Amino acid sequence: MHIYKTTAENGTASYEIQKSRFIAYTSHVETEAEARDFVTAIKKKHFDARHNCSAWVLGEDSSQQKSNDDGEPGGTAGNPILEAIKQHGLTNVVVVVTRYFGGIKLGAGGLIRAYSHTASLGLEATPCLE
């Protein structure tokens, strides 16, 4: 039997930088369909947000990975969220980071840092189990 670390329940955290508000949502999922359903639910909840970027890691060996920038410049949102999941050593988890644009452009580096930091905050606020 392979032991892996995952989230025990849903979590959330928020972060604000230069008037943009970022909100992370995390959830334990077992399948890609569950991950997609969670992303869809967050998009419906925050239909008025500029972006709802996401990433997930599935499987005991973390072999299934997916990220989505949802209109942000390529590689500035979904991939940093995915990296945060991997840095926390988690699998069977999905993270969605919602962004409400505050009118000030953050640049590629600023977006990467903001999405990564917000995802990490969300994961740190979520109880985990092995």
Residue locations for each model-derived region?
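C-terminal regulatory domains involved in ligand/effector binding and gene-expression control
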Residues: M1-G75
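Ordered, amphipathic secondary-structure segments that act as subunit-interaction surfaces
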Residues: Q65, G75-I104
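Solvent-exposed alpha-helical segments within well-ordered globular domains of core cellular machineries
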Residues: A33-T40, E83, R113, H117, ...
